[in-house]
């Protein structure tokens, strides 16, 4: 049988006449990671021909007719290419590229066209750092997933917010091919800290543990006292009393002498008041919010001797002087050689002071004072034996001179008591007592008043703790 020429587009399937199959395409080896190829495109798969019809010839051979693939496939591939280009163009806009970079990226995406192409704009990285993996699965993954794979393999990524290179702990031999700017290791943490400290000049703040702490200061009292009885009462110790206790407590009391006409030692009641105050303070040492009037009230409850007395109880808490007074005993606060503050005598009339008697409630009689003190202030607390014979400004002058002579509080108190007794012995001259007598009509009275004298001098000083 004569051989018929094969029509164009027909395949000869006779024995030994089959056309040899086309050679298989060469396998495309996957490019190693971090290999720099600006355009890495996988070979597109060739579409298989469609069987159009078959015809049996007279010699028994069969002729098959094949046709090109349908246009639907071409349209589908074009659509897939368009879908791949769209997110790439959007990525270019989001990454903030300028006009020239965007124009360069768009043709690159169009030229790729293949299903296996991955571009730099898809992952937000530079083109040289992107590796094409080939196949449709590579394009199916999003740009975020590709970036996550690169970071997990120990690559270097750039943080767009902080513009700082962050490097994962894993490293491969391929990292050696990276540019020198990415291969520089980060500086040690110590160098970074030192640089920050130098720029912000915070070395002094961070080295506070090396600085010697400054000791805090507080104000305290240094107190001393002196007592001089009336010469006629020296055998019994006089009728005045005082106490000095810890933590800035002190006080004076002056027993009323009229009790002596009934054979009662007025000084006993005054001393019991002072002893009771000191005892209560010592028993409650360190307790907070103890007020002078509470101390006085407690001492008055425990006094058993008959009699009456004027009394003053005071406390310095480191800032304020708190004082409770009944009668004509009192205090002066001397600052810079002048009388800064003073108590006011509580009297019914001339030489007739208020007084507390056994069974009385001192809280109904007491007058309270609160005065803020400073370093260098001097408190002179005394019975009327001082204030009846020495003027207030004279007391301030004596205290100022004593401080210049560096005398101690006890020595200052002794000088004041001696001065008061000296003036009390005088029958001439003006005194606070003679002025008060003349003011109420005792004409021709002059000189001082000899009496018991109790003086407590307290100096406010700084104490380093």
From Swiss-Prot:
Residues 222-460 form the PPM-type phosphatase domain. It is an enzyme of class 3 (hydrolase). It catalyses: O-phospho-L-seryl-[protein] + H2O = L-seryl-[protein] + phosphate; O-phospho-L-threonyl-[protein] + H2O = L-threonyl-[protein] + phosphate. It comes from the Eukaryota. Residues 14-47, 68-119, 133-191 are annotated as: Disordered. This is Probable protein phosphatase 2C 71. Its cofactor is Mg(2+); Mn(2+). It comes from Oryza sativa subsp. japonica (Rice). Its EC number is 3.1.3.16. Mn(2+) 1 binds at residues 254-255.
């Amino acid at each position: 049988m004569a051989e018929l020429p094969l029509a164009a587009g027909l395949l000869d399937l006779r024995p030994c006449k089959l056309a040899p199959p086309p050679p298989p395409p060469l396998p495309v080896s996957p490019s190693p990671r971090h290999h720099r190829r600006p355009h890495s495109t996988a070979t597109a798969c060739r579409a298989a021909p469609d069987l159009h019809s078959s015809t049996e010839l007279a010699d028994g051979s069969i002729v098959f007719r094949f046709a090109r693939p349908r246009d639907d496939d071409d349209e589908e591939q074009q659509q897939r290419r368009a879908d791949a280009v769209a997110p790439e163009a959007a990525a270019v806009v989001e990454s903030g590229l300028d006009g020239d970079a965007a124009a360069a990226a768009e043709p690159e995406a169009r030229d790729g066209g293949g299903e296996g192409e991955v571009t730099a704009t898809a992952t937000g990285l530079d083109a040289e750092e992107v590796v094409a993996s080939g196949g449709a699965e590579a394009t199916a993954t999003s740009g975020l997933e590709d970036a996550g794979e690169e970071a997990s393999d120990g690559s270097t990524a750039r943080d767009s917010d902080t513009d700082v290179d962050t490097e994962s702990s894993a490293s491969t031999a391929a990292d050696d091919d990276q540019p020198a700017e990415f291969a520089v290791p980060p500086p040690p943490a110590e160098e970074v800290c030192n640089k920050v400290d130098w720029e912000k000049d915070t070395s002094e703040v961070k080295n506070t543990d090396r600085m010697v702490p400054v000791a805090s200061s507080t104000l305290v009292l240094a107190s001393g006292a002196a007592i001089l009885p009336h010469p006629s009462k020296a055998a019994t110790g006089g009728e005045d009393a005082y106490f000095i206790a810890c933590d800035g407590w002190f006080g004076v009391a002056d027993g009323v002498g009229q009790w002596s006409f009934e054979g009662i030692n007025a000084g006993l009641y005054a001393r019991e008041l002072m002893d009771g105050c000191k005892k209560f303070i010592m028993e409650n040492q360190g307790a907070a919010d103890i007020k002078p009037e509470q101390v006085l009230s407690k001492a008055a409850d425990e006094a058993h001797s008959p009699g009456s007395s004027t009394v003053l109880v005071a406390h310095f808490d480191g800032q304020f002087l708190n004082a409770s007074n009944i009668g004509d005993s009192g205090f002066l606060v001397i600052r810079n050689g002048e009388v800064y503050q003073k108590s006011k005598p509580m009297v019914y009339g001339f030489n007739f002071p208020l007084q507390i008697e056994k069974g009385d409630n001192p809280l109904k009689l007491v007058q309270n004072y609160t005065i803020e003190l400073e370093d260098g202030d001097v408190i002179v607390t005394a019975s009327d034996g001082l204030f009846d014979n020495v003027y207030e400004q004279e007391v301030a002058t004596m205290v100022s001179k004593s401080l210049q002579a560096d005398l101690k509080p006890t020595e200052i108190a002794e000088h004041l008591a001696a001065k008061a007794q000296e003036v009390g012995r005088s029958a001439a001259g003006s005194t606070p007592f003679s002025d008060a007598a003349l003011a109420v009509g005792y004409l021709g009275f002059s000189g001082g008043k000899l009496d018991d004298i109790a003086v407590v001098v307290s100096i406010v000083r700084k104490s380093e703790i």
